[in-house]
Amino acid sequence: MGIMESIDIGANALKTHGLRIDIHAKNIANIDTPNYVRRIPVLNATEDISFRVVLNQMKNDVYGTGTLPYTQGGVVFTGVVEDPTLGERIYRPGHPDADANGYIRSSNVNAMVDMADAIMAQRAYEANLALVYISKSMAAKAVEIGR
């Protein structure tokens, strides 16, 4: 894997985890909004490769530890799904969002779950930002050595 590939992977991860942070922030912001349905980010691997395919492609000589001739590229943000759990029914007959029986649904957002998910996404974002900075400094050193 080259330096530029690591920067590309880091940039892709920054975009992905930034979107995760945005989704969790919107969930937390709408925790008191009636009928709001929690959104869940969906991430998938960029390549779906089976173990056997990877094993067959490994370069494994007598003295080596085994390496792959390519990088898979990490994960990609593929969309958002709505949490199917229902919020609590609350009787509010005059509320504009009330149904025919006078009930509204509270949001199904759990603040602790979304805060924990947002913190994990933030830490992943920070780790990938460090990857980009380190790759950038490695590229600068390589150019400096080449002079």
Regions found by a protein language model. Give the residues of each.
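Amphipathic alpha-helical polymerization modules
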Residues: 1-147
